[in-house]
UniProtKB/Swiss-Prot annotation:
Pathway: Cell wall biogenesis; peptidoglycan biosynthesis. Its EC number is 6.3.2.9. Cell wall formation. Catalyzes the addition of glutamate to the nucleotide precursor UDP-N-acetylmuramoyl-L-alanine (UMA). Disulfide bonds: none annotated. It catalyses: UDP-N-acetyl-alpha-D-muramoyl-L-alanine + D-glutamate + ATP = UDP-N-acetyl-alpha-D-muramoyl-L-alanyl-D-glutamate + ADP + phosphate + H(+). GO terms for molecular function: ATP binding; UDP-N-acetylmuramoylalanine-D-glutamate ligase activity. One of its GO terms (biological process) is peptidoglycan biosynthetic process. Belongs to the MurCDEF family. This is UDP-N-acetylmuramoylalanine--D-glutamate ligase. GO terms for cellular component: cytoplasm. Its main location: cytoplasm.
Length: 438
């Protein structure tokens, strides 16, 4: 447990995570100062009166006078104000670092470009099925500091690359990097390897590293070692096995579950299940209750979620596909009886869209591209693409064309912030329009 007495603490960024940091310090007799670049950040009205605040920008004077800065993952460490503070010797951490210094129970730490939330939630469900007092959160649900509880027996945290950059005390009982594909390139000017390096920090001091046998970028820098357990489609300690038209989850050659018993569907979800099982096994959760959790888990909203099935047409909401890798995961191994009507678009965050091209072949696919980077996406295969300003226009365009056996899939490969509040709002609008048009 760290001692923060008499420390001059500055918290950057409000919202739920910022407020959890304020509460953390107040409970330890330290009154922090708070700043936020937004003029009216969420949570401002919930800030106790004694806490000094500075909004609408950063206060360099406060930062340089601080002993400790707790930075929101939303602000880049490369920001000139943070760089100056770091150069002056000020310690900069995030809420996950504060959490790791306090947590008394084992931690399962999950990162990756795609699938993090599903795997985090699944491991949490496996722990609950075993009767374990588990805290689940971090980058999803509740901020980590709100999970701290002396009675907890296990923590399961989803961690972003930004959170890992400011974390050095994590000693995970089991850690995984599920996959590494281009995302947030606007925050990583040195490209994919810089982003990967942030993700791989999760393995430092971990007891067990769960790696993806199909993605070399998920391996620790020095290569796989005796701490590593692997999962993959055809390879790995945990893998898929197809026999007589049926698919099984297998562990080291032993069949453990037929996927038809699972409510999740799609190859990417089967590998998510393998990763979750590997993590659960690594921290000693009973295999039987973990498998039971796999048969009852229905998946998370906006992640390849069936919004409507009507007149033989399936409308799928995969709004959480905010990067290219996530859309690749949705398209890889996808079976559609008729034509796939694929909705792509939004803010591509400077990503390279070309890896999608190999999934856009044949004559049973149509593209509807919208938003800031719609033109770039339409250029992947212009002869089957139509470009509109908004997703709603695209959906009204495609609705009269769908036939029984077709699928309408929103898997945009882009962030939503150019036209929506967040990916959830985009998914909700898609679902509402699907019910109206379908």
């Amino acid at each position: 447990m760290a001692d923060y007495q008499d420390k001059n603490v500055v918290i950057i960024g409000l919202g739920l995570t910022g407020l959890s940091c304020v509460d953390f310090f107040l409970a330890r007799g330290v009154t922090p100062r708070v700043m936020d670049t937004r003029v009216t950040p969420p949570g401002l009205d919930k800030l106790p009166q004694e806490v000094e605040r500075h909004v609408g920008g950063l206060n360099d004077e406060w930062l340089l006078a601080a002993d400790l800065i707790v930075a929101s993952p939303g602000i880049a460490l490369a920001h000139p104000s943070l760089s100056a503070a770091a150069s002056a010797g000020v310690e900069i951490v995030g809420d996950i670092e504060l959490f790791c210094r306090e947590a008394q129970a084992p931690i399962v730490a999950i990162t990756g470009s795609n699938g993090k939330s599903t795997v985090t939630t699944l491991v949490g469900e496996m722990a609950k099925a075993a009767g374990v007092n588990v805290g689940v959160g971090g980058n999803i649900g509740l901020p980590a500091l709100m999970l701290l509880d002396a009675d907890r027996e296990l923590y399961v945290l989803e961690l972003s690359s930004f959170q890992l950059e400011t974390t050095s005390s994590l000693q995970a009982a089991a850690a995984t990097v599920l996959n590494v594909t281009e995302d947030h390139m606007d925050r990583y000017p040195f490209g994919l390897q810089q982003y990967r390096a942030a993700k791989l920090r999760v393995y430092e001091k971990a007891k067990v590293c769960v790696v993806n046998a199909d993605d070399a970028l998920t391996m620790p820098v020095r290569g796989a070692d005796e701490r590593c357990v692997s999962f993959g489609v055809n390879m790995g300690d945990y893998h898929l096995n197809r026999q007589q038209g049926e698919t099984w989850l297998r562990v080291k050659g032993e069949k453990v579950l037929n996927v038809k018993e699972m409510k999740l569907s799609g190859q990417h979800n089967y590998t998510n299940a393998l990763a979750a099982l590997a993590l659960a096994d690594a921290v000693g959760l009973p295999r039987a209750s973990s498998l039971k959790a796999l048969t009852t888990f229905t998946g998370l909203a906006h992640r390849f979620q069936l919004a409507l099935e009507h007149n033989g047409v399936r409308w799928i909401n995969d709004s959480k596909a905010t990067n290219v890798g996530s859309t690749e995961a949705a398209l890889n191994g996808l079976h559609v009886d008729g034509t796939l009507h694929l909705l792509l678009g939004g803010d591509g965050k400077s990503a390279d869209f070309s890896p999608l091209a190999r999934y856009l072949t044949g004559d049973r696919i149509r593209l509807y591209c919208f938003g800031r980077d719609g033109a770039q996406l339409a250029a992947l295969r212009p002869e089957i693409a139509q470009q509109t300003e908004t997703m709603e226009e695209a959906m009204r365009l495609l609705a009269p064309r769908v036939q029984p056996g077709d699928m309408v899939l929103l898997s945009p490969a882009c962030a939503s912030l150019d036209q929506f509040k967040n990916f959830e709002q985009r998914g909700d609008v898609f679902t509402r329009l699907a019910k109206e048009l379908g």
